[in-house]
């Protein structure tokens, strides 16, 4: 997928040596060991760049991929999905990047509303998603074992994280859990959450091979230490 590197011309001009090394690895070699579709590869790449806080690289990849490998609606949902995991403080700049790229590409905004919940049913529908992904017994046990004074975090997970975002149209369950896995893997230091979302990926039908492929694709952006940590957790959960 060399075309994804088309907008990195400044590096090519000013540091052709690094340009050749990185292009060969990130846009050729890693793809030889991945079974992801082109769409999935772009989604996980964009997800990792959000979590890496790399808006310039995100913009360049988005310019090359929107309306070719991913739709504007999928990009919007990717960005929405990032908020409960990376936080709006980290996601904020990427909203501006997406607006600028869409404007340059002639994509009219705002896009169609994709919400499927109301203020009355968002918690119920969010809990249904939690139960589906992680098992009703596990979610209930988590709620029961949460100390007093902290149970509102479970309420936030039900309503905000899962109710407001996971229920939306635009990305399917497999895509949402895959990019969520990448958000968390990119961060590093969130091993318990990564374990949970490794299991969540398996529950919605993503395979161990797909998770390994996702880490393979994002390795050039997140580095070896975090990639190897993620592989260790994949192997632990999938053994």
PLM segments and residue spans:
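Short, structured motif recognition centered on aromatic/hydrophobic residues
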Residues: 41-49, 78-79, 176-185, 194, ...
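A short structural micro-motif
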Residues: 50, 68, 81-88, 185, ...
